[in-house]
Regions:
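Histidine-centered, transition-metal-coordinating active-site segments
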Residues: 80, 93, 148, 166, ...
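Active-site lining segments that contact anionic ligands and/or coordinate catalytic metals
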Residues: 134, 138, 192, 212, ...
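Histidine/acidic-rich helix-loop-helix segments that form or flank divalent-metal centers
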Residues: 111-113, 182-245
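Glycine- and charge-enriched loop/helix tracts that form the active or gating conduit
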Residues: 1-142, 146-164, 168-186, 275, ...
Length: 332
């Protein structure tokens, strides 16, 4: 009756009944249509897209939990860009994730342009999906550049820049997760952290890599260092094969350096060789700011490679720093 088999063979998604009534009765069907298109690599019939455009505001009556469930399913599809391009075309994305819409477009001043960060983001997302099924890492890929519109600047000599977009973007993640009623637990922390660190390996790969810089990267990323590197490799979207090979080789060097430093210095999930209690007992003091200062100096010395990550050298430095702060060994 509705010729559904024919539509399936043609890879077309359309409603069996009047689409206006279908989408009006249950606005979540608009997102489901997009999700099915993304999961199956189907097309939504143009007339249905136009109806979704006209009914898009009704998505606001749907609970945020049901909306983010559909977003998660789109993110977990083989090629999520299909879904997000449809969300943009239908106007749903502007309502659900306006931060992404602001990434679209190319500015030009004096012949100098920047890339379209919306389509770049979708390329990164599709790239990362080839290497991981981790939903939250896919969220990182989707949101890693959302700070760029707020940090976009033009300089006559250097052209366009987005300095600090990682920091700004990481701050925006919380608002997005809260608005969409996504988990505000360790999953949020994971996404925020990787958005914040998203450019660090890129900077390292384009300069001479020092052990100190690698130690700090491992210290900041912890157990998520491998996911961070996967993100950075997915961020290579150049169409120049030689450049792509060069960037991938650079990241390979960074990965090898990470493995090297990690095996030698044991920085991942760093714990101070001596505790605050040990410092208090040694100097016979109560909790105070001096303890934090001593621990910070020890941490910095280890990350800089000035001392090894062990108790003996940490204790020696503790005594020197303590003496400089006017502390003396407590004699019972």
């Amino acid at each position: 009756m509705f010729d559904g088999v024919h539509d399936l063979k043609k890879g077309i998604i359309k409603t069996p009944k009047d689409p206006k009534i279908t989408f009006y009765d249950d606005p979540l069907r608009m997102m489901r249509a997009v999700r099915f298109a993304s999961q199956l690599n189907f097309e939504i019939k143009n007339s249905n897209i136009e109806i979704i455009k006209s009914e898009k505001e009704r998505i606001n009556i749907i609970s945020k939990e049901r909306i983010h469930e559909e977003l998660n399913k789109i993110l977990l599809s083989p090629k999520p860009s299909i879904g997000f391009i449809l969300l943009m075309k239908t106007g749903l994305l502007e309502i659900i994730l306006p931060e992404l819409i602001k990434l679209e477009g190319i500015d030009e001043i004096e012949g100098k342009t920047h890339k379209d960060n919306f389509y770049h983001t979708l390329q990164v997302l599709d790239n990362i999906c080839k290497n991981t099924n981790n939903l939250w890492l896919r969220w990182v890929a989707l949101l890693h550049d959302i700070g760029k519109p707020k940090t976009k600047r033009y300089n006559k000599k250097k052209g366009w820049s987005f300095h600090g977009h990682e920091y700004v973007g990481s701050k925006m993640v919380f608002k997005i997760f809260k608005r969409l009623k996504l988990p505000l637990n360790y999953k949020l922390d994971y996404v925020k952290k990787l958005v914040l660190l998203s450019s660090r390996p890129v900077i390292l790969s384009s300069s001479e890599i020092t052990d100190s810089a690698i130690r700090r990267l491992i210290f900041d990323a912890g157990d998520d260092i491998d996911d961070l590197m996967t993100l950075c490799e997915a961020d290579i979207t150049t169409k120049n094969a030689k450049l792509e090979k060069k960037y991938l080789n650079n990241f390979k060097v960074v990965r090898e350096k990470i493995k090297d430093v990690e095996e030698r210095d044991k920085i991942r999930n760093f714990q101070p060789p001596i505790s605050g209690k040990y410092i208090m007992d040694y100097f016979g003091i109560k909790p105070c700011k001096e303890i934090g200062l001593i621990k910070e100096r020890i941490k910095e010395a280890i990350l800089n490679g000035d001392i090894n990550n062990d108790v003996i050298q940490a204790k020696e430095l503790m005594m020197i720093v303590g003496e400089g702060l006017g502390l003396k060994k407590y004699e019972k």
